Amino acid sequence: MTTFRSILKLVWPLALGMVNNAVMQFVDRTFLAHSSLAALEAVLPAGILMWIFAGFFQSVVGYSSVFVGQLHGAGDEAGCRTCYRAAKWIAVVSGVLMLPLVPVGEWMLAWSTTSAETLAMEKTYYDITLLGSFFIYGQMAAASYFTGRGRTRIVFWVNLLGNALNIALDPLFIFGIDWNLPLSAFTVSLRLPAMGIAGAAYATVIAMAVQWAVLAVVAHRSMARDGEAATSSGCGDKGDATFLSRERTLDILFRILRFGVPSGLYTILNMLSFTVFVFVTGGVGELELAVSNACFTINYLLIAPMEGFALGASTLVAQAIGRGDREDAARAARRTVLLGVGVALGLSVVVLAFAPLVLGLFASQAGASSAEFHALGWTLLVLMTAWQVFDAADIILSGALKGAGDTKFVMVWLLVVAFAFWLPVVFAVRHFHNTMPALWATMIGYVLVLFVGSVVRWRRGTWRGIEVASGT
């Protein structure tokens, strides 16, 4: 039976890993801000566009964790290894498919950017990170192999290693080095030219490559060890006779695509809808935009752990279904939602308690009136707390639905609510009452409707009849 303690044991490395990624992005942008204003302006649109493309393939590859989870729950460790091989093939193909997206992205950036200097930097960052996204997919395939089996600490420590390397390389690559190290008989000169935004991109790609390499080595050693143990025992794992079966690998590969593609589309639609909202809020006013951006930064740091809870819910539900215990799957989802909402509410209360201090970090950088900045900031933080609870609950419950294979509903429901309900309301508010609090208030209705729909879907139990991995 899934207990709160077992949930926390699985989830905390995932949640901290997501926070770790958020901090890394913040540090990246801080270094670029000291490089040039154009670099800071370029990294956000280029990064968003890259992740709109790469996020789809990352989500598809990452869905292999659900298959690993279900097969692990069923005791089919050979099937888990086959899932990893299938995920690696998807990762390779995904990396190749990035090539034609380079000119597509460059055209989109040229269409939306007026400054030649900023456009050149956007293209540089976009090209390097998009072509280097192969390592992201490889890393995700290996990470999913461990996450689905509940070994989340390995993923966390490797993630921490990669992000620490990224932060260490950032200043060296962005600003360059010119060191003369005197030794006993001669002097060693170390020189690296300043690469600006290209350096930040290279640092990110190198860090991802290191994460992929470490996880891949550990995964292959684990697979070899498990395979040898199964062979020497004389009985093996369930499905061990098909360990090298191409037919089973292809079957799992196409099943991952069947359920993973809607999950990838969900990621794209989520990013697109939120990007449109951010662009709409940019037309309210300079002070309002500065405050909104500051609060969005805070919100990102708070919501990042919920992505870890969602992945944990997906894994726990998948493992329970693999064991044939769908009641425990429901219990795991319910308890993970409760824990996640509690954490989200607690973090929001802490932010509100220290709101003057938190907002003060951004007010000085914005060069705005402190009183006006703090007044509007407080209002937006209160609204953020209101939607944070429902947003956290929906993110985690959507993760549970994905773990049960109900990815089409999650994708279609987001499409309908975001583009047929929320964004039309946002544009109407912009036309009739163009204030930042009014625009932010629409987020509460948006995430509330999303959550209610997810709850109804979960309680109807459609997910109980979905078969994800064959043989479970």
Residue ranges and their predicted role:
Residues 9-28, 128, 139, 162, ...:
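Transmembrane helical elements of multi-pass membrane transporters/channels
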Residues 58-61, 65, 129-147, 155-163, ...:
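Short runs within selected transmembrane alpha-helices of multi-pass transporters and secretion channels
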Residues 37-48, 122, 126, 286-301, ...:
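Small-residue hotspots at the loop-to-helix junctions and early N-terminal turns
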Residues 52-55, 166-170, 212-216, 301-304, ...:
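Hydrophobic transmembrane alpha-helices of multi-pass small-molecule transporters
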Residues 40-99, 103, 136-150, 154-155, ...:
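Small-residue-rich hydrophobic transmembrane alpha-helices
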Residues 1-14, 68-134, 178-261, 317-386, ...:
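Short alpha-helical transmembrane segments in multi-pass integral membrane proteins
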Residues 19, 23-41, 107-116, 174-178, ...:
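Helix-terminus/linker motif at the lipid-water interface of multi-pass membrane proteins
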